[in-house]
């Protein structure tokens, strides 16, 4: 009963996490999308896709938890209930869930999302009102463009089905049972391995750009979130500028007797410039008033004050996240050096590391946390979500680009539906890169075997498990490098690590690209971190004015509700100088 209870609790926790992922996907989609350009089709596809992606990335802690539950950490042997048949059934269930989620992700990202993208592009408001184009015509137009992606999926599958695996030709020198099992795959598995391996490579390239940037920028955004001007101060500064502007307009009109037709061209140009500036200042004053809660309910004003009060906690959280980022970076650097120096077969198998030779902080932390169940699984879930959130942060900062040309911006409340769909596809590929990075670089030993250990003593009789109850020093953490025959029966690798190692062993070029991309990841993170640490956050007034103008055109000024820094001023509602004057500029 105990093993079934533990397994059930793990799956129940996963189901709850997926439910929270659905809620997060809904909030994320509606928060980032333009309110006036919302589409039911785009929203549904984006929510389902994001939920599927989060469910996929959250499956890794479940995978590790299940394989870890099969063994006794202190004795280095399988538990009584962990028979080969029971373990095989558990792994088969995990494989089914993995294959189902990855197949769903591939279907969504390569077919459904492109179809939704072209469906939205086919939409025309005039044709919709006049009824000149049928739904069937729009469906055909979207399917016509989506067919190219369907052909791409078929090509990937058939190439993987017929291309011989390079690992089969170079695997003869690998005398470890673990690697031999990785090479044993049928044609269907080989085709799927090739397709996913190629997508992992593409995702790793995006991961290098976006996740590395986000991993550095996300903590810094918490630490340096306070801009250099507060809402009360912005209101006062804007009011002063608006008063000077109108005074100058009155001077120009008095100078020319109020006759605009006889006004010199120089004065006319200056007056036109002042009028444009006045409109900008009026919009800015409205935003400052809304930021202070004027015209809003007491609930909103109270919430704004609470956020200002707890802003120091945001600073502390940013410092802690920065510490986590640095520790993860150091751990990945150590793993990179360890793999480059001590890999069993170097580039021939994608730099698979048989056993950790250098102390690795993150891996050590997981092994120590495993002593207090389920702390290690909670930390792993946090690490996975931290990488995921960092990817979103990097995507929002960098935007969707082709080379140096920005195609779409990812901004809260201003993201076009097309950008939402493209960003979802990019996040799907990045998820593959995150899975590789966490499993192979951040916590390589823990991600493969979890907390499993192996008793190196010889069994007392044939068919019996070894006994290390009186020799705890002979209990070692499981690793791919063990050559004992019983090791393969006691040490059960996670499904994710097995799949990734199969990719890198069968197609070493994928493994080489994924491995050396981690070096680029470390370099980009360091550059972005150092740069952002020495940059002072500034309030982008031009961007603020653009957003205010867009809100005014859309009639959405009531929902803007921006907050500015200067904690104490936002709490008191004063700028530290004279009280704000009424603008009367509406």
UniProtKB/Swiss-Prot annotation:
It holds the Pfam family LMBR1. It comes from the Eukaryota. One of its GO terms (biological process) is protein localization to vacuole. GO terms for cellular component: vacuolar membrane. The chain crosses the membrane at residues 10-30, 47-67, 96-116, 147-167, 191-211, 315-335, 378-398, 420-440, 509-529. It is found in: Lysosome membrane. One of its GO terms (molecular function) is cobalamin binding. InterPro entries: LMBD1_LysCbl_Transport, LMBR1-like_membr_prot. Glycans are attached at residue 540. It is a multi-pass membrane protein. Keywords: Cobalamin, Cobalt, Glycoprotein, Lysosome, Membrane, Transmembrane, Transmembrane helix, Transport. Probable lysosomal cobalamin transporter. Required to export cobalamin from lysosomes allowing its conversion to cofactors. Belongs to the LIMR family. LMBRD1 subfamily. This is Probable lysosomal cobalamin transporter.
């Amino acid at each position: 009963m105990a093993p079934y209870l533990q397994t059930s609790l793990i799956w129940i926790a996963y189901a709850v996490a997926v439910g929270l992922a659905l809620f997060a996907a809904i909030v994320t989609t509606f928060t980032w999308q333009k309110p006036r350009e919302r589409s039911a089709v785009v929203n549904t596809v984006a929510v389902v896709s994001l939920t599927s992606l989060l469910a996929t990335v959250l499956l890794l802690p479940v995978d590790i938890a299940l394989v870890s539950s099969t063994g006794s950490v202190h004795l280095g042997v399988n538990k009584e209930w962990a028979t080969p048949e029971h373990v095989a059934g558990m792994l088969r269930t995990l494989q089914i869930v993995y294959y189902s989620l990855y197949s769903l992700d591939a279907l969504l990202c390569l077919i459904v999302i492109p179809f939704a993208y072209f469906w939205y592009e086919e939409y025309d408001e005039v044709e919709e009102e006049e009824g000149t184009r049928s739904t069937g015509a729009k469906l055909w137009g979207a399917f016509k463009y989506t067919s190219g992606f369907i052909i791409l999926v078929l090509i990937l599958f058939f190439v993987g089905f017929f291309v011989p695996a390079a690992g089969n030709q170079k695997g003869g020198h690998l005398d470890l049972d673990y690697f031999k099992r990785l090479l044993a795959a049928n044609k269907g598995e080989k085709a799927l391995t090739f397709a996913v391996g190629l997508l992992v490579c593409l995702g790793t390239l995006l991961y290098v750009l976006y996740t590395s940037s986000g991993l550095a920028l996300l903590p810094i955004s918490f630490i340096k979130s306070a801009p250099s001007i507060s809402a009360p101060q912005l209101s006062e500064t804007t009011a002063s500028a608006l008063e000077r502007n109108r005074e100058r307009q009155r001077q120009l009109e008095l100078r020319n007797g109020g006759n605009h037709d006889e006004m010199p061209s120089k004065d006319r140009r200056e007056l036109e410039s002042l009028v444009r500036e006045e409109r900008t200042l009026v919009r800015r004053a409205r935003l400052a008033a809304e930021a202070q809660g004027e015209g809003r309910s007491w609930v909103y004003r109270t919430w704004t004050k609470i956020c200002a009060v707890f802003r120091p906690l945001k600073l502390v959280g940013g410092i802690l996240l920065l510490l986590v980022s640095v520790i993860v970076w150091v751990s990945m650097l150590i793993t990179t050096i360890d793999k480059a120096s001590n890999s069993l077969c170097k580039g021939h198998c994608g730099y698979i590391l048989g056993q950790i030779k250098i102390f690795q902080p993150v891996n050590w932390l997981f092994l120590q946390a495993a002593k207090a169940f389920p702390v290690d699984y909670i930390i792993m879930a946090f690490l996975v979500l931290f990488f995921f959130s960092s990817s979103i942060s990097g995507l929002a900062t960098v935007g969707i680009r082709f080379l140096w040309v920005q195609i779409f911006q990812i901004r809260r409340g201003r993201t076009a539906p097309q950008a939402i769909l493209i960003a979802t596809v990019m996040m799907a590929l990045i998820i593959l890169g995150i899975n590789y990075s966490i499993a192979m670089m951040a916590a390589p030993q823990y991600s493969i075997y979890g907390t499993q250990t192996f008793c190196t003593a010889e069994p007392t009789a044939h068919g019996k498990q070894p006994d290390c109850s009186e020799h705890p020093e002979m209990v070692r953490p499981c690793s791919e490098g063990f050559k004992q025959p019983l090791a393969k029966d006691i040490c059960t690798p996670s499904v994710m690590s097995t799949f990734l190692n199969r990719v890198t062993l069968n197609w070493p070029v994928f493994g080489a690209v994924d491995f050396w991309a981690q070096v680029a990841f470390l370099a980009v993170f360091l550059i972005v971190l150092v740069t952002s640490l020495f940059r002072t956050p500034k309030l982008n007034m031009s961007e603020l004015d653009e957003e205010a103008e867009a809100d005014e055109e859309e009639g959405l000024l009531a929902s803007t509700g921006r907050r500015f820094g200067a904690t104490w001023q936002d709490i008191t509602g004063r700028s530290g100088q004279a009280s704000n004057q009424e603008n009367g500029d509406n």
